[in-house]
């Protein structure tokens, strides 16, 4: 029987070995997808492909409009779910409904930046149905491509909540309704009522009701932040409607108010002039001489 034979890598193997890109080695970037999202036709000059980038962390949602340059990616506009408390949504900043609000905020912000917010108001009342922006007579809608990164694009994923928010906000993003929450695979169509329920946080409200009945103690702990803010299951839809209206009223980014840094005391020694250094040296020499004279007097007293 032949045993395990270790593959011998020759000197030529190491000499010709080429490492992959750093972000591929770290598992952060899908370069196969990126090259298709950034490469532009060579007969189009200074016309970048804009990407609608959505990323999730444990406590935040980031949505950005990005375009690629040789020097690196440039972020044209960004919106974060931690901005939503300013619009009245203080809890549940990472769910499907919050993702919708973040996408809507980014869409209104970038259109205002480009002066298109009056021409393209988008879908003002979120019904859950699919929406495509219609081109106006003068200027075309702002077009971007969805960049999900390494997120698994399952049906009902939060990234498609952000996509729906951006579409209703007035952006032109190529898409299909097959991945929105509420799409029924058997019937091959989107159930707009289910999708509307997710947009307005109805799935969270249902969970609140069921947990309050079945496990009251767990409900008090799980939804403690909701209870502190006085948010209940029945008022969820009205809350999100107010948030959507507030976003449309003022999508601009608020400047953060930071305290001025405290002035620290400096402990650097002051640089002395030549005269000061000379005077200091004389003082030290006099002190040494006086101490040496005192020692001599003590020795004479001891001898006596």
UniProtKB/Swiss-Prot annotation:
It is found in: Cytoplasm; Nucleus. InterPro entries: Rbsml_uL18_euk, Ribosomal_uL18_C_euk. Keywords: Cytoplasm, Nucleus, Ribonucleoprotein, Ribosomal protein, RNA-binding, rRNA-binding. The keyword Cytoplasm applies. One of its GO terms (cellular component) is cytosolic large ribosomal subunit. GO terms for molecular function: 5S rRNA binding; structural constituent of ribosome. CDD domains: Ribosomal_L18_L5e. It holds the Pfam family Ribosomal_L5e. The keyword Nucleus applies. Gene3D superfamilies: 3.30.420.100. Residues 285-304 are annotated as: Disordered. PANTHER family: LARGE RIBOSOMAL SUBUNIT PROTEIN UL18, RIBOSOMAL PROTEIN L5-RELATED. Component of the ribosome, a large ribonucleoprotein complex responsible for the synthesis of proteins in the cell. The small ribosomal subunit (SSU) binds messenger RNAs (mRNAs) and translates the encoded message by selecting cognate aminoacyl-transfer RNA (tRNA) molecules. The large subunit (LSU) contains the ribosomal catalytic site termed the peptidyl transferase center (PTC), which catalyzes the formation of peptide bonds, thereby polymerizing the amino acids delivered by tRNAs into a polypeptide chain. Belongs to the universal ribosomal protein uL18 family. This is Large ribosomal subunit protein uL18. The gene is RPL5A.
């Amino acid at each position: 029987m032949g045993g395990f034979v270790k593959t011998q890598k020759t000197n030529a193997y190491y000499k010709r070995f080429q490492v992959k890109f750093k972000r591929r080695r770290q598992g952060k970037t899908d370069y196969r997808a990126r090259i298709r999202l950034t490469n532009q036709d060579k007969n189009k000059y200074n016309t970048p492909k804009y990407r609608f980038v959505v990323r999730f962390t444990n406590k935040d949602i980031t949505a950005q409009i990005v375009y690629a340059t040789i020097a690196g990616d440039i972020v044209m506009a960004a919106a974060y779910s931690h901005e939503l408390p300013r619009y009245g949504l203080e809890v549940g900043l990472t769910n499907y409904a919050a993702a919708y609000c973040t996408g809507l905020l980014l869409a209104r912000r970038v259109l205002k930046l480009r002066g298109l917010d009056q021409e393209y108001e988008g879908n003002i009342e979120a019904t859950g149905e699919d929406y495509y922006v219609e081109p106006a007579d003068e200027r075309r809608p702002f077009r971007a491509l969805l960049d999900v990164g390494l997120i698994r694009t399952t049906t009902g994923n939060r990234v498609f909540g952000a996509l729906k928010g951006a579409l209703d906000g007035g952006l032109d993003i190529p898409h299909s309704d097959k991945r929105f929450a509420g799409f029924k695979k058997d019937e091959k169509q989107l159930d707009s009522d289910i999708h509307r329920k997710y947009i307005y946080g109805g799935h969270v409200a249902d969970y609140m009701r069921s947990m309050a009945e079945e496990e009251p103690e767990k409900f008090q702990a799980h939804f403690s932040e909701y209870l502190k803010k006085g948010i209940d299951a029945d008022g969820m839809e009205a809350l999100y409607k107010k948030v959507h209206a507030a976003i449309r009223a003022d999508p601009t980014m608020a400047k953060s108010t930071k305290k001025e840094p405290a002035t620290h005391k400096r402990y650097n020694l002051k640089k002395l002039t030549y005269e000061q250094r000379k005077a200091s040296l004389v003082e030290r020499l006099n002190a040494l001489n006086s101490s040496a004279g005192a020692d001599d007097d003590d020795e004479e007293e001891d001898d006596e």
